[in-house]
Amino acid sequence: MSPLPSFLTSPPPSVGVEITSDRVTAVSLSRQASGWIVSAHGTERLTSGVVTPGLNAVNVHDARALSAALRSAFDKLGARPRRVALVIPDTAAKLSLLRFDKIPAAAELDQLIRWQMRKAAPFKPEDAQISWVPAAALPGGGREFLVTLARRDIIESYMRACADAGAQAGVVDLASLNLINAALASGDTTAGDWLVVHVAPDYVTLAIVRDKEVIFFRTRQLEGDADLADLVHQTAMYHEDRLSGATFARVVLSGASARGADAPADAAEKHARLRRGLEERMGVKVDALDFRGIAAMRDRISAGPDLLDALAPAVGVVLRERVA
């Protein structure tokens, strides 16, 4: 699989950071003889209104509060990082799959992709930040391309918050893409198509992966658990009718424990309830995304779903450049 798209790249950092509408999380990974280790992590809550993710509106409303939360999370790592890989909410950007039945020449491909995305952007073309990678091959020699579009000033506002906290963001990426990175890096070899369900505080993203390539990606606002079950059912029907799919070989759920839960016990129950509801609706086993197959937790025998959910995107963005 080609690396999933990133807005900005440079040599990979060993610290991943995720910013959501209600918290910031920092994770430090280290390489040991036994493999990758989550050597430290820290989370700080954000008060309502500090960050409100969106494609075409101000996202960071209180830069000082966001930077302070990032500094507090960095302090919990033991040493403040100078460089980080940054994960931002899916709703801060637009991700599309562009299809070319005949792949243009390399000199034209980038221009065509950028032209198509800028044409559909709800803001001035010159304000667009665009990143793309090859995705699934098509019969007859064509290919899909996974393209991410965002407003440049929105991306820069998240990066600036990190810089004000003392860390440069060498990589900027989306949350759900890095859940996929974490799942792929964990080495599951299940044959067939699989579904990733990412439940954030204010949205849900559904992604379908086939042969390690994203073939479907949809982000929607989420009002309640019933809406989630309906969206998953609709996605399963689309998968069968339009993508020539059968029953999903694997369904991975992440983030459910953080939605509406105020304590670890609440988080575990929330995750279990959503998982059972999806299993009943789909008739398929639903697993929590567990990255510990590739990055073990240091000095921790077990980790609850709330912790795994909180760390997974930041772990995924660190592993994306390090695990084939």
Regions found by a protein language model. Name each.
Residues 1-324:
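Hydrophobic/aromatic-enriched cytosolic interaction surfaces used to assemble or bind macromolecules
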